[in-house]
A protein has these predicted regions:
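Short beta->alpha connector loops at strand-helix junctions that form conserved
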Residues: 111-114
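Flexible acidic/glycine-rich loop/turn elements at helix↔coil and beta-strand↔loop transitions
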Residues: 30-36
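Structural alpha-helical scaffold elements that stabilize or flank donor/cofactor-binding regions
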Residues: 30, 123-125
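Conserved AMP-binding/adenylate-forming core of the ANL superfamily
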Residues: 17, 36-91, 95-99, 116-121
Length: 125
């Protein structure tokens, strides 16, 4: 499903502000150019958001982590064009999930962490 009208797509493409590159294409380019540069860093208050020590991933590490998660997701039955709701705090693993799901061609529907069972149940119908 595309939600952007064709005329708007044409408008932005003609101005060079919208292209054919995907999220994963941008990651692959950074892995080629600067694999050891930091790509994503946990917030200082990670411990308030979730368990575990703060993480830092380079572009190469982010690519490898998202590849590994994508393979796990395939094993769990997640497939191309499937819709997945994702509810996570703003931590490194969220970025890994987005890239893994994008590599599989999955449609991601992010949910605010404040949503509880009622909201999630309603949205999943």
């Amino acid at each position: 499903m595309y939600t952007t009208p064709d005329h708007r797509i044409t408008h932005w493409v003609n101005r060079g502000l919208w292209g054919d590159r995907t999220l994963c294409d941008h990651l692959a380019l950074q892995v080629d150019i600067r694999p050891q540069q930091l790509a994503v860093i946990d917030p200082a208050n990670r411990i308030e958001l979730t368990q575990g020590d703060p993480l830092r991933l380079t572009y190469a590490e982010l690519d490898a982590a998202s590849d590994a998660l994508a393979l796990d997701l395939i094993d769990w039955g997640v497939s191309h064009r499937q819709r997945v709701m994702l509810q996570m705090p703003n931590v490194v693993e969220l970025v890994v999930c987005y890239f893994a799901l994008s590599k599989l061609g999955v449609v991601v529907s992010p949910l605010p962490v404040q949503y509880q069972a009622h909201e999630i149940s309603t949205l999943s119908k």
